[in-house]
Amino acid sequence: MEELLNQYRAMGISPAVYEYGEKALARLAERFAQIDRVAEYNQAKVIAAMQKNRVSAACFAATTGYGYDDLGRDNLEKVYADVFHTEAALVRPQITCGTHALTVALGANLLPGDELLSPVGMPYDTLQEVIGIRESPCSLAEYGVKYRQVDLLPDGSFDYEGIQKAINPKTKLITIQRSKGYATRPTFSVKQIGALIDFCKSIKPDVIVMVDNCYGEFVETMEPSDVGADMVVGSLIKNPGGGLAPIGGYICGTEKCVSRCAFRLSAPGLGQEVGANLGLMPALYQGFFLAPTVVASAEKGAVFAANLYEPLGFKCVPNATESRHDIIQAVELGSEEGMIAFCKGIQAAAPVDSYADPLPWDMPGYNDKVIMAAGAFVQGSSIELSADGPIRPPYAVYFQGGLTWYHAKLGILMSLQKMVDAGLVQL
């Protein structure tokens, strides 16, 4: 459509880049239809949970102070528990981010002398300090919790033999990171996670299994809690917040595990009874309601990105045809210059701070300089269109988000345009 092409041209996208994108898009009709089918199922699942728990306007009332008898907060946790098919849920704006939620879950369920096992290799950068892999005050290691790790096999599969040897009487909790994080391994499917949980529990039935579910919610019709996870943990400024939640995190799981998490978050004896919602309930409810369709938009953007960059010779994880289990698309660009150009394109497509110039910086919690592009309405929201990555080989940029598919499309086209303008790509 000439009118659309002119609008893109006015925003700095050349006809060559636009036409290259349209050719890629023409191949994706069935992939997009499949994504929409999953979104439709998950949308119905969320609505059913809200109806079952009789969500009403009364749930949107603000509370302050202690937050005793907070109807909206307590009911939202019932909705989450029903959607994730768990006994209980802790969904709070007092949880500041995904790393905080994971820290609460680990600290609540591990005691001095216990052992934590990761059977999927090194955890995400920020969690390394939480555990004590990298020294930090108040880490689990400082409190006497031991850590053991089993790396993935070279083909990215689980090392079942190594895991069997690693599980011992002191193994209290097993942590499984669903998403790739800043690695280039594949993200695990719910089915794969279920098989791993079954294997671990066949060796030690009472072991607690926690899944870091960040970036994975609503990408499939099932969640890790459907296949045996004792806790699933995530951030409300990622998938389940639907782009509307301004802060927050969640922990869904068994009554025992979640109850301990509540005591860790607030205080022993207080647990889930305190924690005012501060007027955030409308955003948290509506964001969760919108989340399945927002996640679908983000996933379409990831698929589109792989189908643009892979034919140009860049390694994409997942590749252009693989099934997807989170919203992250990794593209190995081979150089710092490529990462900067890509991120400048994402930033230039943003509705907020589009004029900003992303550059690598020393971000707290990371060992390497990190570049981030995110013109977001909620600071740090990675369900909104964003791209980031550590400045280290293989110089992979991690693209995720897009509250609407059309914004995700614009961002990817703009990233390619900046690569072309920098002389890093020829179409």
Predicted regions and their residues:
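ATP-dependent carbohydrate kinase catalytic cores
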Residues: N75-K78, V83
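Short glycine-rich or small-residue beta-strand-to-loop segments that form or flank ligand, phosphate
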Residues: C59, T63-T64, L90-P93, I327-E332
